[in-house]
Amino acid sequence: MKSFNELVGKLSDPASRQALKSMQRGIEREALRIEKSGHLALDKHPKALGSALTHSRITTDYSESLLEFITPVFADIDELVEDLTLTHAYSVRHLNGQRLWPVSMPCYLGDGADIPIADYGSSNSGQMKSLYRKGLTYRYGAQMQIISGVHFNFSVSDKLWHRLYELSDKSLSLDDFISDSYFGLIRNYRRLVWVLPYLFGASPALCSTFIQDPKTSNFPFEVIGDGTLFMPYATSLRMSDLGYTNQEQDNLNISYNSLTDYLTGMQAAINMPSANFAKIGVKVDGEYRQLNDNILQIENEFYSPIRAKRVAKGSEKPSESLARAGVEYIEVRALDVNPYSAVGIEKSQIRFLDLFLLNCLLQPSAPSDATEEAEIAENLQAVVLEGRKPGLLLKRSGQELSLTHWLESLFGNLKQIAQLLDDEGQDDYQVALAKWHKAVENPNETLSGKIMAGLKDEQVDHSEWVMELAEQYHQQLKAYPLTENVDKRYQQDAVESLEKQAYLESQPSVSFDQFLVDYFKV
């Protein structure tokens, strides 16, 4: 494979630069509904937002209280953020006085018993979605499931694939080359995944209510104000063992070395029984507790900071879609909600992600082994827990390397890509890169650094600060202009989604027991 510098040189002609620029992106942003008191909203998904089962833009994640806003695919960043903003603006007008929680970590009082699991109605597919979430509750507790994040979907253009294929040795078919290259991107992303919590991690602190007993926690928390726990150099507690973790999955060792390896590993994981989860029971006294007692109930339960994806046809499982036609796009899952944006992510982050992911694609990407996977996990944990610590050392190929030195080297590569993406008289990518470059030498310029500086300077509780932001963004989004046509379109989408759910529920169907048997047939 050609070196990074060789590839960048080959892509510097006008046609190649245009192909490079034609990226497609989509965003999924999760946000809890909260009452004005700051407590979690416990009511049903608002009817004005349509059916969470069938609406294409507004749904729920784990809980009835956890909204998820989904954009279509856009090639233009301004249009992407505008669409996300309009969906937020419409939604906040229909929350009956509730607000959206603008950070990843919830401030929740309780044992999780009252957190309402998302309800998708009485159709078999709706019941299955709810039961999957019930299984997550039994397995990991409800509290972990109401942590929110932002997912970034990304693909490059067919034109770029044809250009890169021309520059390859053509030992694979074009389709196989595309999947192989996406897996190369994924491996490089995993090697560098720590960069995202370093820059964009926004959960260095949380409400003490999230930890049942801070004194018995393994984390060396310090306290600000009345009830805010923090770690001095943490970047993303959401990405730590406090957040999304699953020790059962630690031994799955699913390989990203090829699509075939990945699908083989996923198939094995789906069918691997768990002694721990068997103790819960699948159907107890006539009532389901989980879909099955395997390590993964379904593929979606597999936690990874990046996923290979393809749009499913009909009732295809994710791996069936990939097996049918290969990788279509990737989903970045390592982003905290950005509290400095009303919609959880800002344009400079999107431009950085474009550069970061293109770098992961264009760099050579050797297969990964168990030793490197251990390094990857170690580096990520080091950065989420103490990424802003002066002189922090990470590991690369068995050698220690300072985080700052590694970042400087990376930013040098990103600058070359930014120069290809910016047209004459336009410097959006270079400006975004310069903005985040400030955080390389000065950790206070990271999102987590800014948050901690603000909490310490003002000596406010995390929850108080977040409530102020929630109110500010509520007013901002409520005032955001919605034309009559746009408002009508959202109303129509809501009505049509409810009709679609009602239609699904009116159709003759097999029993739910039989539906599950059919779904899990190998």
Swiss-Prot record:
Disulfide bonds: none annotated. One of its GO terms (cellular component) is cytosol. The keyword ATP-binding applies. Keywords: ATP-binding, Glutathione biosynthesis, Ligase, Nucleotide-binding. Pathway: Sulfur metabolism; glutathione biosynthesis; glutathione from L-cysteine and L-glutamate: step 1/2. It comes from the Bacteria. It catalyses: L-cysteine + L-glutamate + ATP = gamma-L-glutamyl-L-cysteine + ADP + phosphate + H(+). Gene3D superfamilies: 3.30.590.20. One of its GO terms (molecular function) is metal ion binding. GO terms for biological process: glutathione biosynthetic process. Its EC number is 6.3.2.2. SUPFAM superfamilies: Glutamine synthetase/guanido kinase (SSF55931). InterPro entries: Gln_synth/guanido_kin_cat_dom, Glu_cys_ligase, Glut_cys_ligase. The keyword Nucleotide-binding applies. Belongs to the glutamate--cysteine ligase type 1 family. Type 1 subfamily. NCBIfam families: glu_cys_ligase. This is Glutamate--cysteine ligase. It comes from Shewanella pealeana (strain ATCC 700345 / ANG-SQ1).
